[in-house]
A protein has these predicted regions:
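Active-site-proximal loop/turn and secondary-structure-junction residues that shape catalytic pockets
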Residues: 48-52, 72-74, 102-103, 150, ...
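Hydrophobic/aromatic-rich, well-ordered segments within soluble, folded domains that form packed cores
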Residues: 65, 69-73, 289-303, 329, ...
Length: 698
């Protein structure tokens, strides 16, 4: 083992103020108080907060930190921070380095400058950040980062972390009720475990700088299909190029220093596409870590003259990027509640948790679809590269057979675990999993967890996990209400499983989600099919969903309606930015470039005619390009008029529909016209790098 490899355990988490560092630097009383705060939510006395703050500051300054920031996750989907130095005047024009318990525990931010959905007006600017002691502070770029929640002056949530923490707490409470019914008195907490698989593209910075659409929108707004894409399937799991490997190595080291469990990396399907997957951890930490991962992907790429694209669909014609959210439940004693065991038909506890998940997904499929809706994800979902827009659950043959036997009241004989015959004697036998890998399913059971595959690559994982946690808490609470009152627990459990699986079996689909027939089958089953963000957003204000989140105190009705408004406004603004960017590129570069080329073609035709030479090829091309350029000009004019006539982005559903049906429709038409022009215009005239230039630049 070489020296750098030996050092990994030593420097892992070296920039994190974790439990070990607290144990070393805090008094026994302060450490115990922090532990009680972590496990039981006990408030920290001011004196203890002061001691923790002082220890945290001393540790951070030893690492070179000069500032601290309350790091929070507003409704923008990315993190926010305001940096304050540790300096405090001490008289005689001198300073000391200090961080008080008050500064650690609470900060202030201008809430009116972040998306609030009407919860904050410009003249109601005050918002507060409050320390989340369940997330470790860390040092990055000579700044102490303190994870916090963000709320308004009146206490309404303005971030993504607060609802997540609330949902984790509610789920914990309901899981313990179920475990007690099965005689488990050892577990004191149940924590959702999450492992997000992060996909991304890496392109050369010089190519990025020459495309306004990439710089302003994060994706290309046009691009003719390159001669080679992903047809040969040669990029997926292919050898990692040296330049990318060096980037990945540095990224791993940066993440490991911050305590992020970066584990697996490989090439993805599309050219220039890659994936990074971490080891599972609790949902709150996983959410923080994924935000750090996305930030460091961009930062480290920049050091290597690369650009990391996190957009869901940066290039048409090749696979887009998603983020598979692997979700499970674990007790503080180490038991995975979604692990079937060797005989799932007899594992009643597992079946009850499975029933709760199936029931919850069926009843709240609209809000699950809604929580992954985003303009970028609209370009990916429903194509033959990502799950369809219809929510369904894949269980695999064995579990489906178990459910069928419960529904029909027949005995079930467990399948003997088969062996996959490899056919090569030198290889060991590999046990065949009881579930295949159905890549077309939005929610797939993969042995001991559910894989939610609809998330977009740029999306925070906070909202989807908040929804999963709340749905599960609600269903488990209903089950506990029934079983706690049962005279005969075993009989009541059997009836509950039978009734639940029978009532909600429509949500289970083990087939090919890419097949066109699935949409019709889903309609026949009564499943919802919201094709885009605009159609799915009303789920936020559906009385059923408002009732779900308010009865568990995850959101208030006002907070739900605010998020509905924020997402619709965001849709309008993103669509407007893309349309304006494309309009600028067409008017300033594409139309003039094609005009120059056609002018030169026209002169070539005249010269050939003067020499009585055949110029039919040039004439045909000239006519084709002239027609396309004229149509592009007309479409651009219509797009400009549509933008001028557009309603205010704060206009709710009506405004979002206008941007989708009018503005985006014209953008889509213009994009395809540009693609045709690119494919037929001489390379020396074309003003932008092509897909072939960009995708194969690294």
């Amino acid at each position: 083992m070489d020296e750098p490899t030996k050092r990994i355990p030593e420097f892992f988490g070296c920039m994190v103020f974790n439990e070990d560092k607290m144990r070393q630097r805090l008094s026994a009383d302060a450490y115990e108080a922090w532990q009680q705060c972590m496990t039981h939510g006990t408030p920290l006395p001011r004196s203890i907060a002061d001691q923790i703050a002082a220890a945290m500051k001393d540790w951070a300054t030893e690492l070179g930190a000069t500032h601290y920031t309350h790091w929070f996750q507003p409704m923008t989907g990315v993190t926010a921070e305001k940096h304050d130095s540790f300096i405090t005047p001490s008289g005689n024009d001198s300073v000391i380095m200090e961080l008080s318990g008050k500064e650690l525990s609470r900060g202030e931010a201008d809430a009116s400058s972040f998306p609030s959905g009407g919860l904050r007006a410009t003249f109601e600017a005050r918002g507060y950040t409050a320390w989340d002691p369940t997330s470790y502070a860390f040092v990055k770029d000579k700044t102490l980062y303190i994870p916090t929640v963000f709320c308004s002056y009146s206490g309404q949530t303005l971030d993504k972390k607060t609802p997540l923490l609330r949902s984790i707490s509610r789920l914990d409470q309901q899981c313990l009720r179920i475990l007690r019914l099965f005689g488990n008195t050892e577990a004191h907490h149940v924590i959702p475990q999450v492992g997000p698989e992060q996909e991304y593209f890496l392109i050369d910075k010089s190519m990025y700088q020459r495309r306004e659409d990439l710089k302003l929108c994060g994706r290309t707004l046009f691009g003719a299909r390159p001669p080679k894409g992903q047809e040969l399937d040669d990029h997926y799991y292919g050898a990692i190029k040296p330049r990318v490997a060096i980037f990945m190595q540095e990224l791993d080291e940066e993440l490991w220093k911050l305590g992020v469990f970066a584990k697996t990396e490989h090439n993805e399907v599309a050219p220039a596409q890659h994936e990074l997957a971490p080891v599972y951890t609790d949902a709150n930490t996983a959410t923080d870590h994924n935000q750090l991962t996305m930030a460091l992907l961009k930062k480290v790429a920049d050091r290597h003259d690369l650009v990391c694209l996190l957009h869901e669909k940066p290039f048409a014609g090749v696979n887009g990027s998603g983020k598979h959210d692997n979700w499970s439940l674990a007790t503080d004693t180490g038991e995975n509640l979604l692990k079937p065991g060797k005989t799932p038909s007899q594992n009643a506890q597992f079946l009850l948790f499975l029933a709760a998940f199936i029931k919850g997904v069926d009843e709240y499929q609209d809000i699950l679809r809604c929580c992954v809706s985003y303009p970028g994800n609209d370009l990916r979902l429903g194509g033959s590269e990502a799950p369809p827009a219809v929510i369904s659950i894949f269980l695999g043959d064995e579990l489906t057979a178990v459910l069928d036997s419960i529904i029909q009241g027949t005995a079930y004989v467990d399948m003997t675990k088969k062996k996959l015959e490899i056919g090569v004697d030198t290889l060991p036998e590999i046990p065949q999993d009881t579930t295949d890998r159905n890549r077309t399913s939005p929610l797939a059971f993969t042995g001991n967890k559910f894989e939610f595959r609809m998330l977009g690559s740029s999306q925070s994982i906070a909202s989807p996990n908040t929804v999963l946690n709340t749905i599960m808490a609600d269903e488990l609470g209903q089950f506990a209400d029934i079983l706690e009152q049962a005279q005969d627990f075993k009989s009541a459990l059997q009836t509950l499983l039978h009734d639940t699986f029978k009532a909600h079996q429509r949500i289970i689909f083990n087939g090919n989600g890419y097949d066109d027939s699935w949409a019709e089958e889903a309609r026949r089953r009564g499943l919802s099919n919201h094709r885009d963000t605009v159609d799915s957003m009303p789920a936020y204000i559906d009385p059923k969903n408002i009732s779900l989140f308010t009865r568990h105190d995850v959101f208030s009705e006002v907070e739900m309606r605010a998020r509905y408004g924020i997402h619709l406004e965001n849709y309008c603004k993103i669509t407007a930015i893309e349309a304006n960017t494309l309009l600028s590129m067409i008017r300033r570069n594409i139309f003039p470039a094609v005009s120059r080329y056609t002018s030169d073609l026209a002169r070539a035709v005249q010269r050939k005619k003067a020499l009585y030479l055949d110029c039919s090829a040039e004439t045909d091309l000239l006519q084709q390009l002239t027609n396309l350029n004229n149509e592009l000009y007309t479409t651009a004019q219509s797009m400009a008029q549509a933008l001028e006539n557009a309603p205010a982005s704060e206009g709710g559903l009506a405004s979002a529909r206008y941007y989708r049906d009018v503005v985006y429709a014209l953008e889509y038409k213009a994009s395809h016209l540009v693609n045709e022009l690119e494919a037929n215009t001489s390379a020396e005239y074309w003003p932008y790098p092509t897909y072939a230039d960009i995708l194969f630049s690294v």
